[in-house]
């Protein structure tokens, strides 16, 4: 797991502009390479902007395939929200679970966070729901009719993982 680099622009562009991602997240609109290039160039620390975006790359060839985010960071309560996005061709290979484990280790051990919150649309996002459940996240609540996609509203599940002291 590492910080975003300029060479990650195509990964970011592919994920941010994937309509399947729009269907289950709040992204919902195309993003230009120019805007993403500016975003990568302006990366700040988690404490400066309450968001940290990292990349997970394969060990054998260093090819970046996963983006993980920490956002809504609260240093006092030691919590953050997290997100995870995989390239479509890399789904179903265990990379999501591995990336989530790396992010949790970083959040717990380096940032000393007490808890992580994950949101997942309940329709069309079965893999994410299964990932969070298998990683020990508890469903802490449901936001009714929270996400609009393909002409209808769906619920948003809230998952929380609390780390031991």
Regions found by a protein language model. Give the residues of each.
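Conserved hydrophobic/aromatic "anchor" residues
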Residues: 4, 106-108, 137
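Conserved acetyl-CoA-binding loop-helix of GNAT-fold acetyltransferases
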Residues: 92-106, 126-134
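Conserved GNAT acetyl-CoA-binding A-motif
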Residues: 109-121
């Amino acid at each position: 797991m590492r910080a975003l680099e300029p060479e990650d622009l195509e990964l970011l562009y592919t994920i941010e502009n994937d309509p399947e991602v729009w269907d289950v997240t709040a992204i919902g609109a195309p993003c230009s390479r120019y805007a993403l290039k500016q975003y990568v160039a302006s990366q700040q620390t988690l404490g400066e902007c309450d968001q940290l975006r990292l990349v997970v790359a394969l060990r054998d060839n260093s090819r970046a395939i996963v983006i993980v985010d920490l956002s809504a960071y609260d240093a006092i309560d030691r919590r953050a929200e997290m997100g995870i996005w995989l390239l479509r061709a890399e789904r179903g290979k265990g990379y999501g679970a591995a990336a989530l484990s790396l992010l949790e280790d970083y959040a717990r051990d380096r940032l000393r966070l007490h808890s992580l919150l994950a949101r997942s649309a309940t329709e069309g996002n079965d893999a994410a729901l299964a990932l969070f459940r298998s990683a020990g996240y508890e469903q802490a609540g449901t936001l009714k009719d929270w996400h609009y996609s393909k002409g209808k509203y769906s619920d948003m599940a809230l998952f929380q993982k609390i780390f031991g002291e």
